[in-house]
Amino acid sequence: MTGNLEKLFDSHSEWIQSEGEDGEQLSLERISSDQLTNEQLQMLTDSVLTECSFTNIELRENDFYHTEMYSCKFNNVSFGEVQFIKSEVNDTKFTDSNFETVNFNNAEIFDCIFLECTFSDSTFISTGIWNAMFDDCTFVNIDFESAYFEKIILHNSKFINPINLDKATKIVINIGTVENPLLLTHEESLKWIIDNSI
């Protein structure tokens, strides 16, 4: 498997450098982070990850630009200065993870779960999030300019110094459950966040 992975990453590197003219885009399925070297973890830009798992690791200055994730799992992961610009994250679960100075600009996040996560000094500028659940999460110094949040569930979550909340494009919070939704309007959602800010 190690040899096959090396060939896949070499081909992906060639694909990136040639802007798609040569090589092949990296597509990994059911790979765990302990199967990858630190160098390979830094080479996931513009890749496709399906049912991959990342556990008990620190990702620093990794670039997930334009990366697609499907049904992945991140458990006890520390994200530091990581780029998620224009990434697409689907049906992925993040548990007990920290996001510090992470850039989610123009990312699209669908049907994801964030459990006991902390976001600090990060940006959700022009980020779209649909049908996601944030349970026991903390948001510190997060920039929400032009953010678009549709039907997100915030359970036992708190905000500290939210930035540019008034410049968000649309925020609709579900204060009910998936089975029994209770949707707030944009204005009500902003008030809810402010009321739950420290």
Each model region followed by its residue ranges:
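Tandem repeat scaffolds
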Residues: N4-D10, G20-I198
